[in-house]
Curated annotation (Swiss-Prot):
Domain of life: Bacteria
Record's catalysed reaction(s): 5-amino-1-(5-phospho-D-ribosyl)imidazole-4-carboxylate + L-aspartate + ATP = (2S)-2-[5-amino-1-(5-phospho-beta-D-ribosyl)imidazole-4-carboxamido]succinate + ADP + phosphate + 2 H(+)
Lineage per the UniProt record: Bacteria, Bacillati, Bacillota, Bacilli, Bacillales
Name of the protein in question: Phosphoribosylaminoimidazole-succinocarboxamide synthase
Alphabetically ordered keywords of this record: ATP-binding, Ligase, Nucleotide-binding, Purine biosynthesis
E.C. no: 6.3.2.6
Transmembrane segments: none
Gene Ontology annotations of biological process type: 'de novo' IMP biosynthetic process; cobalamin biosynthetic process
Family annotation (HAMAP family): SAICAR_synth (MF_00137)
InterPro entries noted in UniProt: SAICAR_synt/ADE2_N (IPR028923), SAICAR_synt_PurC (IPR033934), SAICAR_synth (IPR001636), SAICAR_synthetase (IPR050089), SAICAR_synthetase_CS (IPR018236)
PROSITE patterns assigned to the protein according to its UniProt record, in alphabetical order: SAICAR_SYNTHETASE_1, SAICAR_SYNTHETASE_2
Gene3D superfamilies to which the protein is assigned, alphabetical: ATP-grasp fold, B domain, Phosphorylase Kinase, domain 1
Pathway recorded for this protein: Purine metabolism; IMP biosynthesis via de novo pathway; 5-amino-1-(5-phospho-D-ribosyl)imidazole-4-carboxamide from 5-amino-1-(5-phospho-D-ribosyl)imidazole-4-carboxylate: step 1/2
Record-level Gene Ontology MF annotations: ATP binding; phosphoribosylaminoimidazolesuccinocarboxamide synthase activity
Length: 239
């Protein structure tokens, strides 16, 4: 498989065409951004870590029957994935109060929720990726009610698999963001990535943060935090 011309470049990844109409080539970048791109930095090794961690987690999900776009890891920073039409919704599942939800509800960060909360955010940089209701989604016409139901169900299923998997590594899955795509056959499958860029991950005992909050809040060395997650998941750390 060959990497051809660049199709798209986002904050964290570049997407390239391949000679297969059904596949695209993903390259993870070393860029870190926060606050809708207002805070930016190049962090050497971050792309490798996100690629390695996403590979491990997508393989885990595929093992239990969850359909994803992941095909294979091509290098330390690259992977081959199925081409899909991305649904312009970020699906956020929350198990513990943190970040914007803690502020929105006026409740203490770290409060464990009795059951997970699923939220939808409209993917639009100009609007700041706003929180939307199912009624808003219908007005925006970006997903049908049936698709929204599938997104919610898949998010909750993935959540339970990841909660258990991270718990075995002594990590608490606080919350995480997913993106989904539609195949040419009309099936909804998991796309994008699952990494410390898209999850809040805390040590189950100390609540030490191993995610992008380290960068957002200037809590320490980002690559050290991501390396710790990779090590606990059984990947090969470069520390």
């Amino acid at each position: 498989m060959q990497k051809l011309e660049l199709l798209y470049e986002g904050k964290a990844k570049r997407i390239y065409r391949t000679e297969s109409a059904d596949m695209v080539w993903v390259e993870y970048k070393d860029s870190a951004t926060a606050f809708n791109g207002e805070k930016k930095e190049t962090i050497t090794g971050k792309g490798r870590l996100n690629n390695e961690i996403t590979t491990l987690l997508f393989r885990k999900l595929q093992e239990v029957g969850i359909k994803t776009h992941f095909v294979e890891k091509l290098s330390e920073t690259e992977q081959l994935v199925k081409k899909v039409s991305i649904i312009p919704l970020e699906v956020v599942t929350r198990n513990v109060l943190a970040g914007s939800l803690s502020k929105r509800l006026g409740m203490e960060e770290g409060t464990v929720l009795a059951e997970p909360i699923v939220e939808f955010y409209f993917k639009d940089d100009d609007l700041g990726d706003p929180l939307v209701t199912e009624d808003h989604i219908r007005v925006l016409n970006v997903a049908s009610p049936e698709q929204v139901s599938v997104l919610r169900d898949m998010a909750l299923q993935i959540n339970q698999v990841l909660i258990d998997h991270f718990a075995s590594c002594r990590v608490r899955l606080v919350d995480f963001k997913l993106e989904f795509g539609v195949t040419d056959e009309g099936a909804i499958i998991l796309a994008d990535e699952i990494s410390p860029d898209t999850c809040r991950l805390w040590d189950e005992t100390s609540n030490e943060k191993f995610d992008k909050d380290v960068f957002r809040r200037d809590l320490g060395n980002l690559t050290d935090a991501y390396e710790e997650i990779l090590k606990r998941l059984g990947g090969i750390s470069h520390v």
